[in-house]
Amino acid sequence: MASSHQQQQEQDQSALDLITQHLLTDFPSLDTFASTIHHCTTSTLSQRKPPLATIAVPTTAPVVQENDQRHYRGVRRRPWGKYAAEIRDPNKKGVRVWLGTFDTAMEAARGYDKAAFKLRGSKAILNFPLEAGKHEDLGDNKKTISLKAKRKRQVTEDESQLISRKAVKREEAQVQADACPLTPSSWKGFWDGADSKDMGIFSVPLLSPCPSLGHSQLVVT
């Protein structure tokens, strides 16, 4: 470090000496003086300027999503971008059962898992083992809630119909009590009552001839 500093001072001193010599004495030619000055200045600047360090920029590889590269069991990608799910039914000699078309591979994989768990139970090989049975339980809960709501609605409708029928029967009974129509049965009861001692309107005694006309009075016993 000290030697380079000393060398730089010597070069600066030599440049000053050349300038002084040019001012006080004459050089053989102006070109010789210019070339000497250029050599001194360039050598001085090259020593002062530190070398540039080359920095290597790392190249980043394109990020590829794991979901696009992973192959799920029972899932196939269609040419138009959708994902189809299917499963082999052991009860039908391994016949493929179509499960539907999904927008993403994960949805199709979950559809396969649901069908596989329903067919094979705990022995099924699933894409998402930690989610085994969750979708099935959720579906059962929804069905149970739907059935309860349906039963409650049916009971309410039955009660409403029963109340309406009772109200209609009451109204019919009231109308019959207010105005009893003349029917053959009612006339039959009327005539049957005429044979009794209390004959209603027919209980009036027979009229005898008027005595003022000279007829004797008839008494009916």
Swiss-Prot record:
Main location: nucleus
GO annotation, cellular component aspect: nucleus
S-S bonds: none
Highest taxon, organism lineage: Eukaryota
Single Gene Ontology MF annotation: DNA-binding transcription factor activity
Keywords associated with the record: Activator, DNA-binding, Ethylene signaling pathway, Nucleus, Transcription, Transcription regulation
Listed name of the protein: Ethylene-responsive transcription factor ERF105
